[in-house]
Structures are given as C-alpha cells and as structure tokens.
C-alpha cells in the first residue's frame, strides 16, 4: 500500500497495473478505490480528478481503508474539499491515525516536524514516535522519515544511513534527499560532489522528479559560465535545460513548473520573456496546491503582467489569496484578511472569520512577509540544496 504514498511509486506503475486497479475499483474493491484515488490525485490524469478522487476515497473509507480517511483529511487541509474546515480535517486525520493509518501518522509527523497546517512544531514528539516505530520494524517508509527528521535538525551527514536504508527497501522517492546526504556536510558545503551527482542520476532513473530538479538547478548556474560569445553552445545548453524541465513537469513535479514559470517570467538563461507561458506554468503548479505558485500568480495579476479574459484580475487575485491563505502562505494570508477588511472575498466570510483572521492576528509584528516566508513546499529539501 505504501507505493501509493509517493509520486515516485505511482510513476513506476505500468499502464497494465493502473488499468487493473481501475477495473478492481469499478467492481467495488475498497483498497483499489483508494489506490485509484491516489493515482488521480498525484497524476491529475482524469477529468475533474478532485471530485473523482474524493468519491473513491469515500467508498474506500466506508470499506474500512484507514489510509483513505488520511487522504481525505489531507485534501481538507489543503482546501481541495469545500467548505474549508481545518478543525474537521484534524478530526478526520485523528480517526485515520486511531485506525492505524500509516499515511495519517506520516502526515501528522511531518506537520509536527515542520509546523505545517496550523500545527505547532514538536520535534521531540516526532523523534519519540519515530524511535518507537523503528524499534518495531525498520520499514523503509519510517527510515525515510527519520532521515527527514535529521535533515531538518541540520544533521545531514547522519541522515544518510536512514535514506540508504529507505532506498534499499524500495522507497525511491527519497533519492533526492539521499543525494544531499551523500554529497553535503552539515554546514551545506560539498564533501563529495561526484557522489551527489551520481545519486541524482540514479534517482532520476528511479523516477524521483526531485533529482532532475536539483540537477537542472545546477545546470542553470553552469549556463552563465559559458562564454557569451559562444552562442551555439549557449543555445544547445539552454535547449537541454528547457527540455529536461518540460519532461520533469510530465512527472507532476510542481517545483519544476514553478521554475519554468520563473524562467519565462524573468527571462533567465536568455529565454525571451513570455508572461503567458510563465502564467501557464504557475497555474499548472497551483493545481498541485503549490503555495508559491499562487503567490506568483497573484504578483503577475497585481502588476498587470497578465490579463485574463474569463474574469477580472481582481477576481483572480481573490482566488489566489484564499488558496494561499489555506496553504498557510503568510503573505497571501495577510493579503486575504486585508482584502476582506476592504469588502472583498465576502463569499469566504465564514472561513476568513473563523480561521484566517485568528491566524493573521497571531503573526508577530516583526515577521517578514515576503516569498521567503512561505512554508516548506518540498519538506525543506530545497533549503538543504541551496
């Protein structure tokens, strides 16, 4: 079942395997309903994938699949299920955990580790819980989470042993983390660049899209080392970067979508500025509930870099704000509350009054509210790379 907790696991499924799961789900098998829902949520390959996944998860939950309750709770926390109600989401998550959902336990541990979705950070409880789980069985899933814990604590070198165990057990989604652990010192300086790069290539073969993302970030820096007079070399290198990123978007990686948006919005690597393409990539990333994509869409609308035909820029900004607030983006949370105070977003009045205004009031006066203030969309892995 843990195959369906990670993008890398789902990407590795063959078309025949996915078709079999779909057939079993149509026949009413609750586990297959859960699996098919996760495929829809990760890959967005069916029309109206959110409502289709929700319906399948409800069937799986009724059939006793605890992980389905965890997935529903996650959708509720992210604002994919209306009305937005994080209190109800927390209760649904508690139900999943009480029924033995590994997915629910892992989600809760990450919330406590990174202080996400309104949970107060509690690394002591995370460590205690992981020690208990690993004393029973060194499951690769929990090994990966222990690696995440150590990485978040700044113990990059120590995290390597746990990521090694996770990968050895088939947890392919942590190759990007393993590359960092093999290559970096605790102060983020390189101790073995070759091991780092080799692991990225290994992880790319194992379908961890984070590996290609890290690899291309490195190549973007290298682009500027090419002699500007050598236009052919720069053209070929640029084409390689764009092609690799486009392939990675097919692996449903929202950080890659955001990066492509940045390239076209800012004209990086000598790409002609194209706000329409930039907007398209940010929209694609936002479909995966990637908070910073909502922030960049908001910025483009605010500065009139893009004009939408279907709705006014102000209406679109409202949608960006409320989604960002739901995802605990501090800057968009502030924008949401300020806009509401000026008579906008009234259709979300209950939600804003109950949840966003209290969160707004709790923000310290001296807290920075720029884009760097967002929560860790990649569980802190980009910070470790940087």
Give the label of every model feature segment.
Residues 17, 53, 89, 126, ...:
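Single-residue signature of alpha-solenoid repeat helices
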Residues 14, 50, 86, 123, ...:
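TPR-repeat structural position
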Residues 320-386:
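Terminal, low-structured helical/coil segments at or just beyond the last alpha-helical repeat
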Residues 35-42, 71-78, 108-114, 148-152, ...:
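Hydrophobic face of amphipathic alpha-helices that form TPR/SEL1-like repeat modules
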Residues 27-29, 42-44, 63-66, 78-80, ...:
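Short helix-capping/linker turns of helical repeat alpha-solenoids
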Residues 44, 48, 84, 121, ...:
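Residue-level detector of the short coil/turn that links helix A to helix B
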Residues 166-168, 276-287, 312-329:
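TPR/TPR-like (Sel1-like) alpha-helical repeat modules
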